[in-house]
């Protein structure tokens, strides 16, 4: 990359264009291109090559380079394109390789050559589809990359060629986690020479997960040979079309500049599409925008409308529609099939394949600096993030085994069943179920288990509980229908004895799917009891006895006795979870940044005393690392300490953990909750207690009022007299809050039985909490209105437990 011609100092660039090299046959001078040739010439045909004046190193498209960015270890890349840019004078686009040393051993393909770390070839590279820009000053030299056959037959690695000769036989994604099958790298180079856009697209389709590439799954099975044949067949057609259009332009003598034919308007993408998808636009070698005015544009359009686009799913869709009609039509129902659009490929922005290097703006490293300590801090924060993929789930072995055995048995026996999983938030319920599904998938791929389908429904993501019917039917048939029709179709589908694979449905956040009639949950728990359904339902909720408290007997009985409870993590388990993530660090970063065991124990005990939520413990540790990193950077600014700091390890101590905990304690929401009066805290305590008893996120205002009074009565019986001793030895909190006021309570004629149903100013208290975003209320002031928390339950619990008067209620 060169931002201006000034940045090209020490380099020369050449335009490899056959037309520019043409000379007049008579006088040897360059000829001026005719208007016809200039119009027919595409700027994309000009290739740029570079030459370094110092050592005459020449660089062109397809060369393999050794690049060193920001004082990091050199990496290998292939030059995809050298072109004149919009923001920069010259852009050098490369596709990165990942070295073997940057791949975690657990992520390598499970094949014989990668079985032991000692047998791995350190000179093996993995090609990726990740594109990036490099600067001219970052280019070190060229390297050689060979195929497996060339490397094994002709090359002996020694000190002379160890840093410049490599082997490539697989590709992978930018994270180094998904790998392609073995290929011949020389065939891949031939594909690059023919079309470098198809080269990148081929690697991308082989390494992008199927979930992000659902509409192109058929390309997964294509080999390099197939892709080469496809490119060969495409080339003549494109040239013919371009030539025909160009000839038509010449015949009209450029008199039709303001017109475009119907064919070209349909085939050529708009300018907005060209800007949004560079790879797609460059792969289509279109001729210039001038077009011949079509004499019969309408006829051409009508002809194009009759062209039938092949659809691989048409037969499957027809069968699904026929089944829908047979089920819905006899009941005189109006069938409505929703518009279903295929999932588009997500606009992923993969991180750079070089692990441990994070690029920021302008090609520089992020704000953490470029030294090893900053990279260690960055990796440590990544491993402590709650979304980090783990190779195993520590401290959940028993629960994992129970779920695994239940699902494996149901799949093998081709029967339906219900499994109820409960536990407080953050104890690993959903993660454990997903890990079980992943393990079962591996058994299926090895042929040791029957194949099955899997669907995940999250109650928080549904607009209404009935949408669950639509999700399930869409998974089965591929068509979207209305909820009412989907319920009928599902009932008929599970009643019929037709060949089908077992279907596992994970219903997360079950308490959000509860309705007044309970018909949604009844159907989902009833269908597995059908003899031919092969439906396996895993219900996940936050309360163990939710079926008994909320559901009717006919629903709770269908859940059976297959119940698995996840209890909150103890401080020892939280410490094990944090240490497990720290073990995932590289050896170099382990030595550079260390979290003291005392600090881990301090964070674990603090979280275990409140909720046992692993996510909260990881968040606190991650924030402590950020605070420690800030201290490290501030100490690094002192010039005298820079060399000493580089050679030492940095420790995350208890003080950093304490600061992170204090930040959560002293957050604006926590400070607001601490400033609330006793009556407002009593309302919040009533909400928490009611949620614990009912197992539901939403509870009626009347139930919360009753919970408040019952809890206050129990508190009064223990130590309520001591709270108001300074005012009156006979006065209790119920007299104060549910009476007609303090002055009336001090009156000798006041009867303690004459109390109100609600505490004084109750409506004002609830409105204050709603307006400040603590509670949500759908109908104000009504006893049957539903109340739910608008902030984290843990944040309220941590504040109320520090209040001496209210903590005894909880």
Curated annotation (Swiss-Prot):
Residues 286-295 have a biased composition (Basic residues). Residues 247-280 have a biased composition (Acidic residues). One of its GO terms (biological process) is DNA replication initiation. It is found in: Nucleus. Residues 57-183 form the BAH domain. One of its GO terms (molecular function) is ATP hydrolysis activity. Gene3D superfamilies: 1.10.8.60, 2.30.30.490, P-loop containing nucleotide triphosphate hydrolases. Coiled coil: none annotated. Mg(2+) binds at residues 508-509. ORC is composed of six subunits. This is Origin recognition complex subunit 1. It comes from Debaryomyces hansenii (strain ATCC 36239 / CBS 767 / BCRC 21394 / JCM 1990 / NBRC 0083 / IGC 2968).
């Amino acid at each position: 990359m060169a931002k201006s011609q000034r940045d090209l100092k020490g380099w020369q660039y050449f335009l490899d264009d056959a037309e520019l090299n043409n000379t007049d046959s008579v006088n040897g001078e360059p000829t001026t291109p005719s208007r016809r040739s200039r119009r027919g010439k595409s700027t994309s045909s000009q290739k740029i090559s570079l030459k370094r004046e110092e050592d005459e190193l020449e660089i062109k498209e397809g060369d393999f380079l050794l690049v060193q960015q920001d004082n990091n270890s050199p990496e290998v890349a292939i030059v995809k394109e050298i072109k004149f840019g919009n923001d920069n004078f010259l852009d050098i686009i490369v596709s990165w390789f990942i070295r073997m040393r940057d791949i975690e051993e657990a992520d390598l393909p499970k094949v014989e050559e990668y079985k032991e770390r000692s047998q791995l070839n350190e000179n093996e590279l993995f090609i990726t589809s990740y594109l990036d820009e490099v600067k001219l000053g970052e280019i070190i030299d060229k390297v050689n990359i060979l195929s497996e056959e060339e490397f094994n037959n002709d090359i002996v690695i020694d000190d002379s060629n160890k840093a410049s000769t490599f082997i490539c036989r697989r590709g992978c994604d930018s994270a180094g986690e998904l790998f392609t099958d073995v290929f011949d790298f020389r065939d891949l180079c031939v594909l690059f020479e023919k079309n470098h856009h198809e080269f990148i697209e081929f690697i991308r389709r082989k390494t992008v997960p199927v979930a992000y590439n659902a509409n192109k799954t058929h390309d997964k099975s294509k080999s390099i040979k197939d892709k080469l044949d496809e490119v060969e067949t495409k080339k003549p057609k494109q040239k013919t079309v371009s030539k025909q259009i160009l000839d038509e332009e010449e015949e009209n003598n450029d008199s039709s500049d303001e017109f475009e034919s119907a064919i070209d308007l349909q085939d050529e993408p708009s300018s907005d599409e060209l800007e949004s998808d560079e790879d797609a636009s460059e792969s289509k070698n279109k001729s210039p925008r001038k077009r011949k005015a079509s004499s019969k544009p309408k006829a051409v359009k009508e002809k194009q409308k009759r062209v039938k686009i092949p659809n691989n799913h048409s037969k499957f869709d027809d069968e699904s529609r026929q089944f829908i009609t047979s089920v819905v039509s006899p009941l005189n129902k109006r069938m409505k099939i929703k518009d279903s659009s295929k999932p588009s490929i997500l606009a992923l922005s993969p991180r750079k394949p070089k692990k441990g290097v994070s690029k920021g703006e302008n090609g520089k490293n992020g704000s953490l600096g470029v030294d090893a300590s900053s990279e260690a801090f960055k990796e440590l924060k990544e491993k402590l993030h709650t979304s980090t993929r783990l190779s195993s789930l520590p401290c959940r072995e028993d629960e994992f085994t129970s779920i695994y055995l239940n699902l494996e048995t149901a799949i093998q026996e081709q029967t339906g069943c219900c499994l109820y999983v409960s536990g407080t938030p953050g104890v690993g319920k959903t993660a454990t179920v997903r890990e079980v599904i992943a393990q079962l998938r591996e058994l299926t791929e090895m042929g040791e288990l029957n194949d099955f389908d899997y669907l995940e429904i999250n109650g928080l993501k549904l607009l209404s509980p009935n949408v669950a019917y639509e999700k399930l039917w869409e998974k089965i048939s591929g068509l979207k229908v209305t909820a009412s029709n989907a319920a009928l179709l599902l009932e008929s589908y599970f009643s019929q004895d037709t060949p089908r694979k077992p279907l596992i449905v994970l219903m997360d956040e079950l308490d959000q799917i509860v309705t007044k009639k309970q018909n949604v949950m009844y159907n989902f728990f009833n269908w597995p009891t059908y003899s031919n359904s092969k439906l396996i339902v895993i219900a996940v909720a936050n309360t163990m006895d939710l079926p008994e408290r909320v559901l009717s007997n006919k629903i709770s009985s269908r859940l059976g006795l297959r119940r698995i409870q996840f209890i909150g993590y103890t401080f020892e388990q939280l410490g094990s979870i944090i240490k497990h993530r720290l073990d995932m660090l590289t050896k170099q970063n382990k030595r550079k940044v260390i979290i003291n065991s005392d600090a881990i124990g301090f964070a674990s005990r603090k979280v275990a005393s409140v909720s046992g939520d692993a996510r909260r413990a990881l968040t606190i540790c991650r924030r402590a690392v950020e605070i420690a990193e800030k201290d490290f950077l501030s100490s690094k600014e002192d010039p005298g300490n820079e060399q000493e700091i580089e050679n030492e390890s940095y420790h995350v101590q208890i003080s950093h953990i304490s600061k992170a905990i204090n930040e959560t304690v002293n957050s604006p929401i926590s400070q607001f909750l601490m400033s609330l009066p006793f009556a407002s805290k009593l309302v919040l305590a009533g909400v928490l207690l009611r949620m614990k008893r009912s197992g539901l996120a939403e509870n009626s205002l009347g139930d919360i009022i009753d919970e408040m009074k019952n809890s206050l009565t129990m508190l009064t019986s223990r130590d309520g007299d001591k709270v108001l001793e300074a005012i009156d030895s006979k006065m209790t909190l119920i007299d104060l809050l549910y009476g007609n006021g303090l002055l009336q309570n001090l009156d000798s004629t006041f009867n303690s039985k004459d109390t109100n149903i609600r505490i004084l100013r109750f409506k004002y208290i609830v409105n204050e909490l709603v307006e400040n975003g603590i509670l949500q209320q759908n109908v104000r002031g009504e006893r049957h209105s539903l109340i739910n928390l608008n902030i984290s339950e843990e944040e309220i619990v941590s504040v109320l437990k520090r209040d001496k008067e209210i903590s005894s209620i909880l």
